[in-house]
Regions:
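Short, hydrophobic/aliphatic alpha-helical segments
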Residues: 3, 58-73, 254-260, 327
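N-terminal Rossmann-like FAD-binding beta1-loop-alpha1 element of flavoenzymes
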Residues: 6-31
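Glycine-rich loop(s) and the adjacent beta-strand/alpha-helix scaffold that form part
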Residues: 24, 35-40, 44-45, 221, ...
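Hydrophobic or amphipathic alpha-helical targeting/insertion segments
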Residues: 31-34, 81
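Redox-cofactor-proximal catalytic regions of oxidoreductases
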Residues: 50-138, 312, 319
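Conserved redox-cofactor binding core of oxidoreductases
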Residues: 65, 101-232
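Short Gly/Pro-enriched turn/cap motifs at secondary-structure boundaries
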Residues: 73-75, 205, 296-300
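Glycine-rich, aromatic-lined ligand/substrate-binding cores of catalytic
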Residues: 312-332
Length: 332
């Protein structure tokens, strides 16, 4: 008999959400998290501590293809990278799942389409209590349900910017936000519309991150166990190499192994690939799930561009991440 019915490696957006969904099943579930709990402390909202001193960045050293070291600036905590995310929760568009042509090459179509994912988007928006408004963004894909909560109102300067963009022929909209804000009774709201939502931890637990909305609700079920400071280092398989049966991990200076009927690898794009490659055996000499020899290759990081503007007028906005524009989503 296995130690657990399900072992989930990683407690971020994937693992934390899955744990919450599986918890009511009564199955014996183990969560393995390489990090610990992110402390609720005054430094959470300190620009100097967060961005200059890198208080919450892992000291990991990684190596590029030429062996040169670099610091990836990743975060390892219960809740994963969502502990410092901006809580903007968008859906991919239908076209994103198809073949896309770029100057550097072709991105092949996914084996699934948007329609396959739509019910899960709706479920996730409920789990993460997303605030938004359907119908404002002309690029948004079809949905089977409205957002679970109304959109967050813009502050005056952001509203003026929205109006100006609309006057210029664009289609600004209220960004879908995962924050626990009650505009009807702000005096009892968990979210206080602070100026530190994007890129900072939330000491109020008002951000809908994977710890607050996933792991903590899951741990209310007695069948769910969480081990922190427990990085997975290798997956074991059955003798035929047809199924993963266990996980080797480090904790408190020693190495332990647990077995599970189902093992979920949800420790981020890079670290999931690393774990699969590190689990090579005689049946899988190139690493698990790597018959294509593509695991760990072709990684595309979260790509973004920034536009900065200087204003002659003061901008008193505090809670500013409520506005979105997708008119140029596909570069048209």
């Amino acid at each position: 008999m296995s130690d657990y019915d399900v072992i989930i490696i990683g407690t971020g957006a994937g693992g934390g959400t899955l744990a919450r969904h599986l918890a009511p099943s009564g199955k014996r579930i183990l969560l393995l998290e390489r990090g610990g709990w992110l402390a609720r402390e005054p430094q959470n909202w300190s620009t100097a501590d967060v961005f200059i001193d890198g208080r919450y960045i892992s000291p990991d050293t990684w190596y590029d293809a030429k062996g040169k070291t670099f610091q990836p600036q990743v975060h390892y905590f219960v809740g994963g990278a969502t502990k410092l995310y901006g809580a903007a929760l968008y859906r991919l568009r239908e076209k994103d799942f198809g073949e896309l042509k770029y100057p550097d090459g072709i991105s092949p179509a996914w084996p699934i389409g948007y329609d396959d994912m739509e019910p899960y988007y709706t479920m996730a928006e409920g789990h993460y209590q997303v605030r938004g408004a359907r119908g404002e963004d002309p690029t948004e894909p079809p949905s089977s349900a409205p957002y679970p909560f109304p959109a967050l109102p813009h502050e005056p300067r952001i509203q003026q910017l929205s109006d100006d963009l609309a006057a210029a022929g664009l289609h600004p909209f209220h960004a879908p936000c995962g924050v626990l804000r009650d505009e009807d009774t702000p005096q009892t709201s968990v979210c206080v519309r602070c100026g530190f939502c994007d890129g900072f931890p939330c000491p109020l637990h008002a951000k809908a991150d994977a710890e607050v909305m996933g792991v903590r609700p899951a741990l209310e079920s007695p069948n769910v166990t969480l081990l922190t400071e427990a990085p997975a280092i290798r997956l074991s398989t059955n003798p035929d190499g047809t199924a993963v049966t266990g996980v080797m991990f480090e904790r408190e200076g020693s190495t332990e192994t647990v077995t599970g009927d189902v093992v979920v690898v949800s420790c981020g794009a890079a670290n999931s690939a690393k774990l699969l490659l590190a689990s090579a055996n005689d049946k899988h000499p190139n690493g698990l799930a790597n018959g294509s020899d593509q695991v760990g290759r072709n990684y595309m990081f979260h790509y973004s561009q920034a536009v900065l503007a200087l204003s002659k007028e003061p901008n008193p906005t505090v809670f500013q991440k409520t506005l979105g524009v997708n008119d140029f989503y596909f570069g048209d």
